[in-house]
């Protein structure tokens, strides 16, 4: 730690009694709460993680599969940050059988891909991280649908793409942040029978 003095100007005191400053970068994320949700795409399919196949895809699932919840019932870990923002930093994890997997983004063959790695989501994240996404409402008139922007690359969103008869979870670059792209639309629900 340095003894150097840094002059800062307070900007505002928000309702959570956190003091925010101008021109300071976010230097850490601290886990605030965790909520459990299913993810659906615009086709009402559930997101299912299959680590043994190294794939996460939206699928039509049977009632029996849904009851087990294995690979489908996600923990959304909400983080606090030191920067005031309308975007909520989140990370994702899911239980498959008796193991926990967290979502991360990695570069493979020059392309960013979504992966699920065995392990737990950290309580505190110092600095940047390949597991953080920013949760945003999909459109102003669609408060129950969301899109998730990758924290390390602006304009890169979670989406789905048809590949070998699967709707795989991918990262997709949008030319404009306000572009309405249905492949980046996700509905979260605590009930597997939720309809779009």
Swiss-Prot record:
Pfam families: IL1
Subcellular location: Cytoplasm; Secreted
GO cellular component: cytoplasm; extracellular space
SUPFAM superfamilies: Cytokine
Chain's gene name: IL18
InterPro entries membership: IL-18 (IPR015529), IL-1_fam (IPR000975), IL1/FGF (IPR008996)
One Gene Ontology molecular-function label: cytokine activity
Name this protein carries in UniProt: Interleukin-18
Mod. after translation: The pro-IL-18 precursor is processed by CASP1 or CASP4 to yield the active form.
One GO process term, biological-process aspect: inflammatory response
Keyword field: Cytokine, Cytoplasm, Secreted
Family: Belongs to the IL-1 family.
Species of the source: Gallus gallus
Functional description taken from the UniProt entry: Augments natural killer cell activity in spleen cells and stimulates interferon gamma production in T-helper type I cells. Involved in transduction of inflammation downstream of pyroptosis: its mature form is specifically released in the extracellular milieu by passing through the gasdermin-D (GSDMD) pore.
Record text on subunit structure and interactions: Forms a ternary complex with ligand-binding receptor subunit IL18R1 and signaling receptor subunit IL18RAP at the plasma membrane. Mature IL18 first binds to IL18R1 forming a low affinity binary complex, which then interacts with IL18RAP to form a high affinity ternary complex that signals inside the cell. Interacts with cargo receptor TMED10; the interaction mediates the translocation from the cytoplasm into the ERGIC (endoplasmic reticulum-Golgi intermediate compartment) and thereby secretion.
Top-rank taxon: Eukaryota
Predominant location category: cytoplasm
Propeptide positions: 1-29
